[in-house]
């Protein structure tokens, strides 16, 4: 659910991002990059779980059968999403609404996780939250019952053919004007005393803005940390400088790190095809992978006028930007080191899996860039590529040959290119 405050946060953030595009101005038609983009095939970083989005039939209606194929299939004119997020309704009579799309995602090899907005009504009480006397929180004597409620959802989905990969304890506990608030200490108590009884991987705490004061207490408490499997967060208005999380690197060994909800750069009506604004989506994913070390990137509504799939079921420009990652960087692939910024406004990330190297290169400049890619600690022979620009959507380019472990490629102005290198 969107609010004007959250939308304002995102608009302010994107103003800074888009200024770089606006200020580049006209110039020569192409340049050669100042530096090589070096890809070190043996320098492993994080394992990638996947890319995807949210289905919320209770609020905006279910995906149709055809839209499920577009979302989770990986053929032509399909997004290749490998992660689905679903809603844990406070009313169990509505749980059936989540089944069909989740089963379709599973059939296509995607993983499914679930997030609750509210506990059942009989577990909730109102309190005064900064003057709001109708604010909601989980009653302190209902923590165990709430854990069982989450278990019941896990079991319901399993009995209907969906084995959840994970379940969250709460969506945005720190931005709960329209759902249930949790303080950091309340989250800590639940994670320490109750989360261990949940029969699925547990995601916490899903802060709306990656506010570390929400998750630090979990990382600093051995029992709570033991009960958390995935640290999940949202990135609404989060500056890239806040993407790294040193405490997680220090104490989160064996845990996963997911970005579980965002829309970017805004949620304006009918904005999904704006160009070059949509190029910001691939840049945002790049920073999430490279600066944030996230293992999953999950959009808000899959089908929306500002989302990866428009209301008519067609893939949007924003969706094609996501597809440059989701279709090629498959679950279990590993991000590897690459020169992340070989030229101003050029961003490069690289991944390996299935005996391939996948390189995603984003050129935000108003001019084309000729970029040299150097493959280190591995051999390759041929490169396929796909390009999205103002005039193309995942358009296949001519294959390139690798000579002495490097290849040159033209990155069109304001474009994203995915290279698949055969090893």
Curated annotation (Swiss-Prot):
Write down any Gene Ontology CC term.
extracellular region
Kindly state a single biological-process term from the GO annotations of this entry: sphingolipid metabolic process
Q: What keywords would UniProt list here?
A: Carbohydrate metabolism, Glycosidase, Hydrolase, Polysaccharide degradation, Secreted, Signal, Xylan degradation
Q: What is this protein called?
A: Glucuronoxylanase XynC
Active site per the UniProt annotation: 172, 261
Signal peptide: which range, if any? 1-33
**Where is the protein situated, by its record's location annotation?**
Secreted
